[in-house]
Amino acid sequence: MSTPLIPPAPPKKTLQLYTPQYYGLCTLGGLLACGTTHSAITPLDLIKCRKQVNPNIYPGNIAGFKTILSKEGLRGLYTGGMPTLIGYSLQGCGKYGFYELFKHKYSTLVGAQKAHEYRTSIYLAASASAELLADIMLCPMEAIKVRVQTSNPRFANTTREAWSKIVTNEGFGTLYRGLAPLWFRQIPYTMMKFASFERIVEALYTYIGKPKNMYSKAEKIGISFAGGYMAGVLCAIISHPADVMVSKLNSNKKAGEGAGAAAARIYKEIGFSGLWNGLGVRIVMIGTLTGAQWLIYDSFKIMCGFPATGA
């Protein structure tokens, strides 16, 4: 009696870089990286936004936590959590997905040699292009988040209610009145975030000196977190004045007042020093946030069978 033949196992499908599937997974990785991390630090963001709008509202960050907890309860610490989750998940899709796309397209456009020689410029151009599009996705939820977090009495109990009230009473365009300041804040931030991360990670691999194929997955992820945290500190500093202005514009813009006129009035009221309110907490917040985002994003890429960024 003959032994039945066992059909050979189908060859394992390998994932290819720079394919629609690759960009789709990078987009999903960006959603996971940004949506989860921004949601997790909602209490820090809440205190930061309120201090930007009213510097005297809390004597310090710890006092802010205690005050909110005692007056508004644990739920109060996560005021604005839902628009944060929705908005930054959408932004993460665009930020990381488009960055990978534009980085490859721009590198291909100039050729391999020039792409390496001018790689920092490629990182800057790709990240600026990606953020320009990502902020269009973020802006409505950012406007709702700031309004909910800084209004007293409470503006709305749900994201849907806040959206309805703004659109009905002020018009849909109100949700985008902070887009230009958001670009002013986020594009330099993202350019610094991606370009500095890429170069810091490159420097870390060079400093350690091992061949890249000798690193374990844990080591690669550790390098991504370290590089992300260092890049985040730089991001916080360069983007903070615009972050303050976005908070002010979304909470303190008079009816019929243009964004430029409102920004000029607010600057006259708070001065240059006022643009730096809340910087300390933002450095801690953005450093941790950026490190965690790169950790999640590169962990997801490795899990999908792709190399970590810079590896």
From Swiss-Prot:
Belongs to the mitochondrial carrier (TC 2.A.29) family. It is a multi-pass membrane protein. GO terms for biological process: copper ion transmembrane transport; mitochondrial phosphate ion transmembrane transport; monoatomic anion transport; phosphate ion transmembrane transport. The lineage of its organism: Eukaryota, Fungi, Dikarya, Ascomycota, Taphrinomycotina. The chain crosses the membrane at residues 24-44, 68-88, 121-141, 172-192, 221-241, 270-290. Transport of phosphate groups from the cytosol to the mitochondrial matrix. One of its GO terms (cellular component) is mitochondrial inner membrane. Gene3D superfamilies: Mitochondrial carrier domain. SUPFAM superfamilies: Mitochondrial carrier. It is found in: Mitochondrion inner membrane. This is Probable mitochondrial phosphate carrier protein. Residues 45-67, 142-171, 242-269 are mitochondrial matrix. It comes from Schizosaccharomyces pombe (strain 972 / ATCC 24843). One of its GO terms (molecular function) is phosphate transmembrane transporter activity. InterPro entries: Mitochondrial_sb/sol_carrier, Mt_carrier_dom_sf, SLC25A3/Pic2/Mir1-like. Its main location: mitochondrion. It holds the Pfam family Mito_carr. Residues 1-23, 89-120, 193-220, 291-311 are mitochondrial intermembrane. Keywords: Membrane, Mitochondrion, Mitochondrion inner membrane, Repeat, Transmembrane, Transmembrane helix, Transport.
